[in-house]
Amino acid sequence: MTKHGKRIRGILKSYDFSKSYSLQEAIDILKQCPTVRFDQTVDVSIKLGIDPKKSDQQIRGSVSLPNGTGKTLKILVFAAGEKAKEALDAGADFVGSDDLVERIKGGWVDFDVAVATPDMMREVGKLGKVLGPRNLMPTPKAGTVTMDVTKAIAELRKGKIEFKADRAGVCNAGVGKLSFDRNLLKENIEALCSALIKAKPPAAKGQYLVSFTVSSTMGPGISVDTRELMAS
């Protein structure tokens, strides 16, 4: 606490961080914290009641946030021929085939999301050790392996994000910027929760949303009442 200024100490003292708040209250707490010189990202961390070691309880998918992410993405597309031209016309930042594969093998990963046409996946699959740990590998479930590269790029620009439960059963995602109106942030978070609930594996038993924390880049983590989220 000694690293925080007087204002943030006063704000944090007025809240009980041992309890869970409504989603709206949690967002309000974050927005009351002092601003910094950049527009902070609002992140959520969701512990799911799954056993990710079991193949029938792995969760991965995508959702279009209704109000976007507030982030300008660098989009890479693995494609050749007419599909490469289509991707360039649609506004992709990087487009290529074997040349991009070799560049990434060399350690270059200066992009935020990758899209690939199905015919490219044989070569792209060889990049698993580089792209996998960074959640950059294109997948059909996320809609990033597709022949319709124009649609994929447009959806990503509008706010489509991928979600995935890690080995601990935790899903982390950015859901907007702190400058967003409180209701816009709430709508984005509810859209993500709805997608996660729809993706619940039939084999998962017991409480599904175990814990839910919302935070900003430089702000505290606020626990949110999961009962509200399950009901929304």
From Swiss-Prot:
GO MF annotations, alphabetized: rRNA binding; structural constituent of ribosome; tRNA binding
Any one GO BP annotation for this protein: translation
Domain of life (superkingdom): Bacteria
Keywords: Repressor, Ribonucleoprotein, Ribosomal protein, RNA-binding, rRNA-binding, Translation regulation, tRNA-binding
Pfam families: Ribosomal_L1
Positions of transmembrane segments: none
InterPro entries: Ribosom_uL1_bac-type, Ribosomal_uL1, Ribosomal_uL1-like, Ribosomal_uL1/biogenesis, Ribosomal_uL1_3-a/b-sand, Ribosomal_uL1_CS
Keyword Lyase: no
Cellular component terms (Gene Ontology): large ribosomal subunit
Known partners and oligomeric status: Part of the 50S ribosomal subunit.
PANTHER family tied to this protein: 54S RIBOSOMAL PROTEIN L1, MITOCHONDRIAL, LARGE RIBOSOMAL SUBUNIT PROTEIN UL1M
Role of this protein: Binds directly to 23S rRNA. The L1 stalk is quite mobile in the ribosome, and is involved in E site tRNA release.
Protein family: Belongs to the universal ribosomal protein uL1 family.
Protein name, per record: Large ribosomal subunit protein uL1
Provenance organism: Chlamydia caviae (strain ATCC VR-813 / DSM 19441 / 03DC25 / GPIC)
Lineage: Bacteria, Pseudomonadati, Chlamydiota, Chlamydiia, Chlamydiales
Primary gene name: rplA
